[in-house]
Amino acid sequence: MEDTQSVLQEYGLTAQFIEPVSPLVWKVYTDYGIFALKKLKEGRGKHFTDHMVAIEEKGFRSFVPVYRTNSGEFFSAGIQYGDIYYLMPWLQFDQEEERDQKHAYLFRETARLHERTAQELKVRRDEIERYYGQTKKKWEQDKIFYEQFVDRAEKEWYLSPFELQAITYFSETISAVNFALERLEDWYESAKEKDVSRVVMNHGSLSIHHFLYNDAGTGYFTNFERASVGPPQNDLLGFYTKMFRGFPKACPECVEWFYGYTKSFPLREAEVSLFLSYMAYPAAMYKVLNGYQTGKRQHEKEECTQLLKAYWQMKNIEPFVMKIHQIEQEKKFQAENESTS
């Protein structure tokens, strides 16, 4: 509490009441209104405010601003050494809307952010070939690793619960890797003929919990701490990877959100292929398998739970990427027919 009060003094504010919202966020009531005070997570850089200034200069203002201190700084140091805080207006995140409406709005605004910040970069063909070769080699080695794991396990007199589980998931995991490799090949064939690539300002932590609402129901991005310049599909990868974690779930509207985004900011053929490739690759499965194989062991029950969750994530992703691939193939086929007619 003392630390929070000292930080607020740098903004000329005195707290009447302070309500903890999370370990890093406080809702602060003052004579000048309600504010959100956030402590910067350890290890996070302060450069994200530069990104916020940059996107504002490009005409995008749908984000929660960070207030400057009385000395003109974006950040304030706390009493504890190394603690860094920043202050924002308080906005709600519990807007009463259906999930589909919330997400559709989020994806439209993400597309608008990407459209405002998009720029072309020159790319040499040897860079594309090197990236393709390195990624393909790694994923093919992962397939071999899993095959060898299964071969060794099947020779044992006794299979541990984890090994039995891993053998059960083997075929489906390899199929997912093969699909990812096929889409990587599609990306390479499309990208190698071009000498430009597109980058945008990615939010870096896309989530409905980082999309807040004012009293009029207008949405604003917050938490730009992981913002960075990169391919537009990076934000989508981060969002959907988190979305599909956990228990088995059906999400037909997830495809609709994707195409709501592309309606406002159309993705190029190479970008869609690379997005599908990385979405399909079962990274979580290999993370658990590698941990088991390299001796970074936990309790067998916990390892089995982690493997099951990774499997569920892979299976949740499967219908999503297959549906988008189907739609993209149909669009491509239709375009080819129209060009020859």
Curated annotation (Swiss-Prot):
Gene3D superfamilies: 3.90.1200.10, Phosphorylase Kinase, domain 1. InterPro entries: CotS-like, Kinase-like_dom_sf, Spore_coat_YsxE. GO terms for cellular component: endospore-forming forespore. PANTHER family: COTS-RELATED PROTEIN (PTHR39179:SF3), SPORE COAT PROTEIN I (PTHR39179). This is Uncharacterized protein YsxE. It comes from Bacillus subtilis (strain 168). The gene is ysxE.
